[in-house]
Swiss-Prot record:
Keyword Nucleotidyltransferase: no
Protein name: ATP synthase subunit alpha 1
Topology of the protein relative to the lipid bilayer: Peripheral membrane protein
Pfam families from the UniProt entry: ATP-synt_ab, ATP-synt_ab_C, ATP-synt_ab_N
Assembly and interaction partners: F-type ATPases have 2 components, CF(1) - the catalytic core - and CF(0) - the membrane proton channel. CF(1) has five subunits: alpha(3), beta(3), gamma(1), delta(1), epsilon(1). CF(0) has three main subunits: a(1), b(2) and c(9-12). The alpha and beta chains form an alternating ring which encloses part of the gamma chain. CF(1) is attached to CF(0) by a central stalk formed by the gamma and epsilon chains, while a peripheral stalk is formed by the delta and b chains.
Source organism of this protein record: Pseudoalteromonas atlantica (strain T6c / ATCC BAA-1087)
Enzyme Commission number: 7.1.2.2
Residues reported in the UniProt entry to bind ATP: 177-184
Family note: Belongs to the ATPase alpha/beta chains family.
Gene that encodes the chain: atpA1
UniProt-annotated site: Required for activity, residues: 370
Length: 528
């Protein structure tokens, strides 16, 4: 090799090395430190993940195919994950990555009128949500000093509730009863009655049958309730993890509007299925079982959910969220584990009797076993005046029913109590999806407490009530406005209303039972 060639090679190598050194110095590698775990096993609704030592409790983890799960059991080497999507395609060894965040859901006004799942995915075929604001599904309940007493009524449109078991804004009122006793119907009627009342509604269906959900959606659509309602749905074939997070996600949506100063009504249908899904997940994750195989924190599961419903004071917007949780009892057993838990958490319960339901007394509310612990303070004066003695009279009637089942001949006073009680029961009956206005309810209750229905045959009670409601239009406008506001009824106005009722009910008047007559079979007699 000649010296010139050797020099050229040296210069070339030197240039190359200098260029590489300059490139190395200019290079700024964009390295990202990332933990990657792997799927160890997959079973019904859960996965065991190995690795991810820095993952936090309830952190959202991402699996292949944009499937997500919640880190629920944090062990030394493994993580028990609640799956939130279709896990059937996952295999052992698949990569799992952290997201660094907890489960959240989109919130905002564009959710009104939509049907979504607990992850914010739309189910109604109307396109994706446009809201960019998100809230975590698990949030601490409002502090005591931010709350205000329950003072405003939430009208359900059902006479038996608004008169005898009143509900206030910010209250938690449990709806309980056996299967097929009309629990969901009461909640849906309450939603329908909020039309034009500036109350937003959130309906959360937890693990319900598709046919049942479709029927409810059709009812809401038929009555134009989607104008003020958000519907969240998990169906029976969804992973139990979605059932678990559904009520928390729905509550976050309600909280968003409550913090804007709005009044919200939220329905959980039902928390029995929610508890069962949580039990299934806990057993699969090998958490220690307790009573009825439920885990030890089952009480906290529902208490932290329902404590988020309240009435905020004016300094925090003055909004409210009223909760109507639904649970299913078995064989009328109100003392089972989940029912007693929820009775102790809530501010009262509405108990639906299968015996009343089988006799066609709808809504099948057992007034004796139902109570509203705080709603009475929110009841308007007009309601309180006309319904004050109803509960006592109804209780006396039911006591006499038990005595009358033996076919005993009753004296005149007992017969009068029976007659009046039967008409109370008839007045409290109400067709599904037909909530009544405040004025209509007060007029009927006023006629009832003044014994105007006692001379009317039971078979004509429905027609008589319709006539009484139709007579409202003949009243002076100021009186109608007072009735709609449920203001205190002055004696002069009451005379005018009673005169109208007497004229409206006169065509329906019939003779009453005489002393010594036997009464018709009763609820207790049918049960006997």
């Amino acid at each position: 090799m000649t010296p010139s060639v050797d020099n050229n090679l040296k210069q070339g190598y030197q240039y190359l090395f200098e260029h590489l050194e300059q490139s190395r110095q200019r290079a700024q590698p964009n390295l990202v430190l990332q933990e990657i775990g792997s799927v160890k096993s997959v079973s019904a609704g859960i996965a065991i993940v190995h690795g991810l030592p820095s993952a936090g409790f309830e952190e959202l983890l991402r699996f292949p195919g944009d499937i997500y799960g919640i880190a629920f059991n944090i062990d030394e080497h493994d993580i028990g994950v609640i799956m939130l999507g279709d896990y059937s395609q996952l295999n052992a060894g698949d990569e799992v990555k952290r997201t660094g965040r907890v489960v959240d859901i989109p919130v905002g006004a564009d959710l009104i009128g939509r049907v979504i799942d607990p992850l914010g995915r739309t189910l109604d075929g109307k396109g994706n949500l446009t809201s960019t604001q998100r809230m975590a599904i698990e949030r601490p309940a409002p502090e005591i000093m931010t709350r205000s007493p329950v003072t405003e009524p939430l009208q359900t449109g059902l006479k038996v509730l608004d008169a005898l078991i009143p509900i206030g804004k910010g209250q938690r009122e449990l709806i309980m009863g056996d299967r097929q006793t009309g629990k969901t119907s009461i909640a849906i009627d309450a939603i329908l009655n909020q039309k034009d009342k500036n109350v937003l509604c959130v309906y959360c269906a937890i693990g319900q049958k598709s046919a049942s959900v479709a029927k409810i959606l059709a009812t809401l659509k038929h009555h134009n309730a989607f104008e003020y309602t958000v519907v969240m749905v998990t169906e029976g074939n969804d992973p139990p993890g979605l059932d678990y997070i559904a009520p928390y996600a729905a509550t976050s949506i309600g909280e968003y509007f409550m913090e804007q100063g709005r009044d919200v009504l939220i329905v959980y249908d039902d928390l029995t299925q929610h508890a069962r899904s949580y039990r299934e997940l806990s057993l699969l994750l090998r958490r220690p079982p307790g009573r009825e195989a439920f885990p030890g924190d089952i009480f906290y599961l529902h208490s932290r959910l329902l404590e988020r419903s309240t009435h905020l004071n004016e300094a925090h917007g003055g909004g409210s969220m009223t909760a109507l949780p639904i649970i299913e009892t078995e064989e009328q057993n109100m003392s089972a584990y989940i029912p007693t838990n929820l009775i102790s958490i809530t501010d009262g319960q509405i108990y639906l009797s299968p015996d009343l339901f089988s006799l066609g007394i709808l809504p099948a509310v057992d007034v004796g076993k139902s109570v509203s612990r705080v709603g009475g303070k929110a009841q308007r004066s007009a309601f309180r005046k006309v319904s004050g003695a109803l509960k006592l009279a109804y209780a006396q009637f039911e006591e006499l029913e038990t005595f009358a089942r033996f076919g005993a001949r009753l004296d005149a006073n007992s017969l009068q109590t029976i007659e009046h009680g039967q008409r109370i029961r008839s007045c409290l009956k109400q067709a599904e999806s037909s909530p009544l206005s405040v004025a209509a309810q007060i007029v009927i209750l006023l006629a009832l407490t003044n014994d105007l229905f006692d001379a009317i045959d039971l078979a004509a009670m429905d027609s008589a009530q319709s006539a009484a409601i139709d007579g409202l239009t003949s009243l002076p406008l100021p009186i109608i406005e007072k009735l709609e506001q449920a203001e205190s009824i002055e004696e002069q106005d009451q005379h005018i209303i009673l005169d109208m009722l007497s004229q409206a009910l006169k065509p329906f008047a019939q003779g009453t039972l005489r002393s010594g007559d036997k009464i018709q079979p009763t609820v207790n007699e049918a049960n006997g």
